[in-house]
């Protein structure tokens, strides 16, 4: 415990291509894991997966509440946040999620803009302007969704 934050993960956050969505984090196991490891945040499996979904996932909001309570209000992390409907993200945050990973959506925001950006220059600072703006705009929307704009 050298003052370094450590995020643990309990349960398996699979990939959407594997359709692995059933190994949810057990509340009692989460409580024990946190006590034994001293992690500063815990990534939990509550219905998400990495990648793009074929249909929107349904988060187990009650499980989030239960894990949050059992772990002494430890910050909880949601992996696989890309593609989760905004209302479910809001509910997850209200239940105890404190960090959400949106990596797939960030990649697609960037790549989608690269695909439509006119290639009239080889100057990277010009070519990358719109893809970078797409990422910025996406991040701003998620910062607002999570309520983080009220604490910045």
Which positions does each model-derived feature cover?
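Alpha/beta enzyme core
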Residues: 1-72, 86-97, 102, 108, ...
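Glycine-rich beta-to-alpha transition loops that act as phosphate-gripper elements at the mouths
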Residues: 75-84
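Generic enzyme active-site microenvironment
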Residues: 7-9, 77, 142
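Extended, intrinsically disordered, low-complexity segments
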Residues: 115-152
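Hydrophobic alpha-helical scaffolding
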Residues: 82, 100, 104, 125-132
